[in-house]
Amino acid sequence: FSLKPEYGHKPEYGLKPEYAIKPEPSVKNAEISVLEAELQSMRKLLESMNRQMEKLDGEQGVWPVPLQKWADLLRERGISPQLIKRLLRTVQQEVREEDWPDEERVRASIRGSIRQICSKTAAIQPGVLKPRVVALIGPTGVGKTTTIGKLAAGFSIVDKRRVALITADTYRVAAVDQLKTFGEIIGVPVEVVMTPSSLKEAIARHQDKELIFIDTAGRSPHHELHMSELRAFLEKAQPDLTMLVMSAATQAADLAKIYERFANLTTHLVFTKMDETVCGGTILSLLDRTELPVAYITNGQNVPDDIEVATPERLTRYILGEED
């Protein structure tokens, strides 16, 4: 049994179109709202996925296009991947995404972060009632003797201070001769000592000076006997400042090892040969991990010109290659 077709119902075909129940407009609007909400939810999900992908890319050394050029530049300057990540994460926090193509804004953010890492600086101050005793230590070949010559010339000739030089570097005759020559040229007394006790006596003879610089033999950080000898000299000298001299042209991993071996003897840092590397950023990882201040940087062989008091701005410029 079935209704006749004229009554509008065929079980096998359903209602005729003219008899079909049409949805109310409010129902259509509700369906559209649901679809729009679903699209908005999908859009947010995609944005979140993009952010996660960008984060993963940053960890793997790949960044959004406007920041990738900065990642490449920082890498070329010898800055570690970990620090690059930190610097660019700070950019993402401080600079709106639409401003990332603005080189000045991005550079300002990066410079600000690097300046903060380089904020610990302190130069030598001459003694007042007694001489300030300054010892320079470090591995071989980093330019300790030349650095002492620059410091002595600067303080004696430019600042008119009373200065004495003492060398305990008896391993290298050339170093002794070099320091004696410096002394003769700038009119500063130079003493050569062979033992820790004679070093103490030499310091006592120059109590009328404002500054006494001590040149020590270059020591291999891996040679325990050499390190023991250095400690013996420093124990007798009791310097007010002990400056660890390191070459900025040294690879970051080697800088870290040198620092670890000398750190317990050190009060200040000096970086030499800043002019001999295009990877000035190698020192940044070390500065990030130490509380020791940087006193001086050197950028050539000329005495006394090629030495500068370290400042956060000056270090930042060298690290970013802005001194070239």
What is the predicted function of each stretch?
Residues 168-170, 216, 273:
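Generic detector of well-ordered alpha-helical packing
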Residues 137-138, 215-217:
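Glycine-rich beta-strand-to-loop/alpha-helix junction loops that act as flexible
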Residues 1-10, 16-28:
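Asparagine/serine/threonine-enriched low-complexity, disordered tracts
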Residues 170, 175-176:
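Post-nucleotide-binding-loop coupling segment downstream of the phosphate-binding loop, primarily
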Residues 178, 185, 194-205, 211, ...:
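Conserved catalytic-core segment of NTP-binding enzymes
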Residues 132-134, 163, 210-214, 242:
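Generic beta-sheet signal
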Residues 22-163, 167-170, 181-182, 186-196:
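Primarily NTPase-proximal linker/entry elements flanking Walker-type ATP/GTP-binding cores
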